[in-house]
Every structure is written in structure tokens, then in C-alpha cells.
Amino acid sequence: MHNKVVHTVARACQEHGMPTLRFNYRGVGASAGSYDEGRGEIQDTLAVVAAGKARWPAAALTLAGFSFGGMVSLLAAAVAAPARLISVAPAVTRAEFASIARPAAAWLIVQGEADEIIRCAEVQAFAARFQPPPRLVVLPGAGHFFHGRLPELRDAAFEFLASS
């Protein structure tokens, strides 16, 4: 929740007047429970979506996630049906993605070209599987945590939100 990448995307949403909720998955930080291979984390995401819809019923839902959270938010999108989806350096090599359908949402993927954890080529191949393909923004030289590149990440998210 306090990750600088997550904070940067949340700030872009807030600059568009969108309410935001950031949270830790089970077993992270002060959250109860333990890691559940993505299954429980999808349920965590859907619980937060339900709370957000109850608090802001008129707001269009945007899901965003970074790395493992990028995978979880994409899988949760099948149930939550967001208007927009932002996936930052999503963990696309997970088996859960082998047969996933493209979400109906407007979809942005932001990937660092020099990501040392999630290979850029894997994300590009993943994005190319879908029709229509998601909007893919590759930041040259950016690593997994976008050190020194957060303004460009923010700009990509901000521009996507302005156009979708």
C-alpha cells in the first residue's frame, strides 16, 4: 500500500477526481492472514471493490495493480467488471494467465523495458494475445520499481485516464 509505484498510480487517479483505496493483501504489512497463491488475494480485491462501491456508488470502477497485484487485479476484473484497468509490470508468466479472457475494460499496461523481475518481452507477448490489444506503454531503461521514472509512469496513467 505504501509502495511508490502504487502511490504514483493512485495519485494519477486522484488528480482525475477519482476516489482511491490502497490496501495490502492478506499477510502483508499489518493485514491478517497469509499468502494464498493469488486465490485469497482475488477475494481481498473483490472485498475492497465492494467496500468502494458502497462508499462511492456513482464512481466508475478503475482497478490498478503492480507486479503480483497486476496479476490479481486482472483476474479480479473478470468478476468486478471495471470500466478501466491499469496493470503495471504485471506478473504475466503465472499459470493463471494461460487461458484468461481479455477484460471488457479499457486497459493500460505499463512496463519497464529493463525490468529485472518481469521481462518486458514476456509482457509484450502477453499483450499481443488479446484483441483488441491493451494499450501498452514501455518505458525505455525503466526497471521493475521505475526508479527515476515515476513521473513517466504517472504521465502514462494520467493520459490513459483522460482518454478512457
Regions found by a protein language model. Give the residues of each.
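Alpha/beta-hydrolase active-site loop signature
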Residues: Y25-G29, V92, G143
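Acidic catalytic loop of the alpha/beta-hydrolase fold
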Residues: E113-I118, F145
